[in-house]
Amino acid sequence: MRYAIMVTGPAYGAQQASSALQFAHALLNEGHELISVFFYREGVYNANLLTSPAGDEYDLVRAWQKLNTQHGVALNICVAAALRRGIIDDTEADRLGLPSANLQPGFTLSGLGALAEASLTCDRVVQF
């Protein structure tokens, strides 16, 4: 089956993102296809390059990046939610006159259209 995941919780302080990542790995291990992960609302914090967890904590941001690198899963974050929360790529930093970007490599700023497209092309969309 083809899946898409929507994550609405931050990397730390809530369970949604961690559960979503575990679910993603379970899908792939069972031979399912994971088309994309869409990060919305507080979920956009999963794409913050500047996140620095304590040494004894799991690095969820880099784990999402590894999922993208190893399995080619698209990691889309809602551009409107990201801008409101200070997550920007180089293009937006230039456009807004900000000194630098902080979007973790492997993540892409996108609109809700990416979620709609995934909904149309997948068998299941699961929200965390």
UniProtKB/Swiss-Prot annotation:
Lineage, opening ranks: Bacteria, Pseudomonadati, Pseudomonadota, Gammaproteobacteria, Enterobacterales
Protein name: Sulfurtransferase TusD
The UniProt record lists the keyword Transferase: yes
Keyword terms, alphabetized: Cytoplasm, Transferase, tRNA processing
Family to which the UniProt record says this protein belongs: Belongs to the DsrE/TusD family.
Coiled coil: none
Self-association and partners: Heterohexamer, formed by a dimer of trimers. The hexameric TusBCD complex contains 2 copies each of TusB, TusC and TusD. The TusBCD complex interacts with TusE.
Active site: C78 (cysteine persulfide intermediate)
